[in-house]
Design a protein with these regions (language model features):
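Short amphipathic recognition helices of helix-turn-helix/homeodomain-type DNA-binding modules
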Residues: 1-6, 11, 28-31, 35, ...
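Alpha-helix N-cap/N′ positions at the starts of helices
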Residues: 4-8, 32, 106-113, 132, ...
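Internal alpha-solenoid helical repeat scaffolds
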Residues: 82-334, 340-354, 360-367, 443, ...
Length: 590
């Protein structure tokens, strides 16, 4: 029977795992048995103040564990742990009277304890455990719509499978909004804004109407987010502001241009700094880093990534550590540090996923799709996409084919492994759905991958009949993203490449090499931060120069091809190097 209600055990377990320490190791350092410490972590034994002090010292918790331990001979509620935003709101819920009596005393204390334990579980990645605590808080607050709304907001912060909609949570959010109807207090107004922001994001999670909740698809979610942002007061509560900006940015991610998304992220970072919440600070830093990358501001993103690394170290959050490592791997792939990326992707991330999946119940698809995307891109960069079809990775890609970006990626893999006819068939099926893509967000990397397929088919030759009808559509869809932007796959997973280069290879396939060269000149700005990307760009430039023709074009093309070949050799990009050597061996071919 669980007797611990203050979150000490959950926080102890989270910090121990974050420190990379086994249960036996910690037990030895704090002079108690492994079995007793296990029961403390599971909430079946109450820790003494002395044990809490020892654990705090060994794990360098800076008083956080001692603060959670009950004083000797008392059952006092410990001081709050800042495990996430909303702690202030959880401690100041003003409940309406219930049967003539205010909902205070033990009910209020238990509600706060359950929310705090849920926050600790959430930070540790224990999503099912967090849901259990939040659900208990919700049920215990029956008759108190404001408290129940706070509990449902916490539930809505949990990670969920990408591209899928949580229909039960949608119903809970709508139910809380209905219950607050008629409550004219300032607190209720803030809760309504937060609930609507989460509702908007959850509606927008669907990648298409096929995975949406009835008629409430992603476009409806984006519209609700826009309306909610419009009603957000400039001088309102910072917690409400942080929550609304966080959720509404995600809800509108696929429906607003990357520069507009960066503006929202910067507003969130300012609000999070005022709120001084570790949860929102992490959300803000990751949002800013993502949008800086999408806007081609690589060096600014490097600075933000450094801040996020410090945040992950300070909070000891398992989820923050996962996001920090995936962001590091993304940057390793961009800069050509393929060995470092491979160590994370094929070794460390697998351990991390198994740990989180087995012990913490994080939605596995959220983790596996991120790893899958990074594994795919590493294989592509190294010219090893054939391994995709000899491992279980191809099956994983096919299982996620409801995401168009995976269908586009599979078509590209087929083309780059010599299966051009099969790749063309899959490509045409994917292009048939382009009109259903949102205007931004995940649509951009999908379109860039489709442009890469066009380039592969164009270089192979013999596919003019397949390409001619679809090139205008692809060019029109990518045109709004031309410039210095970079297509970012995932949230974040990989940088697929400059959008201007994708526009250029489409122009080249359409028989407009001069236009292609203009696009390639724009693509050079974001590509300068990545030697592997520069090598790909020079190959594309060489092909365009040859097609333009004229005096000096062939020597210029040869120079570009040799530069691309040197870059490919330096970074072990065997497929790219083979393409360069093939074109060098056939003067005039483009």
């Amino acid at each position: 029977m669980v007797i611990e209600h203050d979150g000490f055990g959950a926080e102890l377990r989270r910090r121990r795992i974050a420190a990379g320490m086994s249960l036996s190791e910690l037990a030895g350092k704090v002079y108690c048995s492994r079995s007793f410490l296990s029961r403390v972590e599971n909430g079946r034994r109450r820790a003494s103040l002395e044990l809490a002090q020892l654990c705090d010292e060994v794990l360098d918790a800076k008083g956080a564990l001692v603060g959670l331990a009950p004083l000797p001979g008392t059952d006092a509620v410990p001081k709050a742990v800042r495990g996430g935003a909303g702690e202030r709101a959880a401690g100041t819920v003003k409940s309406p009277e219930r049967d003539g009596r205010s909902a205070v005393g033990p009910d209020r204390a238990e509600f706060r304890r359950l929310l705090r334990r849920g926050d600790l579980s959430h930070a540790a990645g224990e999503m099912r455990e967090a849901e259990r605590h939040y659900t208990a808080a919700y049920r215990g607050a029956e008759g108190d719509p404001r408290a129940q709304a706070e509990a449902v907001i916490r539930m809505a912060r949990r990670w969920s499978d990408p591209g899928q909609v949580d229909r039960e949570l949608l119903q809970s959010l709508r139910g809380c909004l209905a219950a607050l109807d008629g409550d004219g207090s300032a607190e209720a107004a803030g809760l309504r804004l937060r609930l609507e922001a989460h509702l908007a994001k959850k509606m927008a999670l669907a990648v298409s109407q096929d995975t949406a909740a009835g008629l409430a698809g992603p476009a409806e979610g984006a519209r609700l987010a826009e309306e909610t942002l419009r009603r957000l007061p400039d001088d309102g509560d910072d917690e409400v502001r942080c929550e609304v900006l966080t959720e509404c940015r995600w809800a509108r991610y696929d429906f607003m241009p990357a520069p507009e998304s960066l503006t929202l992220s910067e507003r969130l970072r300012e609000a999070a700094a005022r709120q001084d919440s570790p949860y929102f600070r992490g959300e803000a830093l990751m949002a800013v880093a993502i949008d800086q990358l999408r806007n081609g501001r690589i060096f600014s993103a490097l600075a933000t990534a450094n801040q996020y690394r410090k945040h992950a170290a300070d909070t000891h959050s398992v989820l923050a550590r996962w996001q920090r490592h995936t962001l590091d791997a993304l940057l390793d792939l961009w800069h050509g540090r393929f060995d470092a990326a491979a160590e994370w992707i094929f070794v460390e991330s697998l351990k991390f996923i198994e740990l989180l999946r087995a012990d913490y119940a994080v939605p596995a698809d959220n983790l596996t799709q991120t790893r899958l995307g990074q594994a795919y891109w590493l294989l592509r960069q190294q010219g090893r996409l054939a391994e995709l079809f000899t491992s279980d990775l191809a099956g994983d890609v096919e299982r996620h084919a409801y995401f168009p970006v995976w269908r586009a990626g599979l078509a590209l893999a087929l083309c780059e492994t010599g299966q051009h006819a099969e790749g063309a068939d899959l490509f045409l099926g994917c292009v048939a759905d382009v009109d259903r893509f949102p205007p931004s967000g995940w649509a951009v990397p999908a379109l860039v991958l489709l442009a890469e397929v066009c380039a592969a088919l164009d270089l192979e030759g013999g596919f003019d009949a397949e390409l001619a009808p679809v090139l205008p559509t692809l060019r029109a869809r990518l045109a709004p993203h031309d410039g210095e932007q970079i297509a970012l796959g995932g949230w974040p997973t990989v940088l697929v490449g400059p959008t201007a280069r994708a526009c250029g290879v489409l122009a080249l396939a359409a028989g407009e090499p001069e236009t292609a060269l203009e696009h390639f000149r724009r693509a050079a700005v974001p590509a300068r931060s990545s030697q592997p990307e520069l090598a790909r760009l020079r190959l594309a430039q060489a092909r365009a120069v040859r097609r333009v023709g004229g005096p000096g074009s062939e020597p210029n093309a040869v120079r570009l091809l040799r530069e691309a070949a040197r870059g490919a050799e330096s970074y072990g990009m065997t497929w790219l190097g083979g393409q360069c050597e093939g074109l060098l061996g056939e003067p005039g071919r483009a």
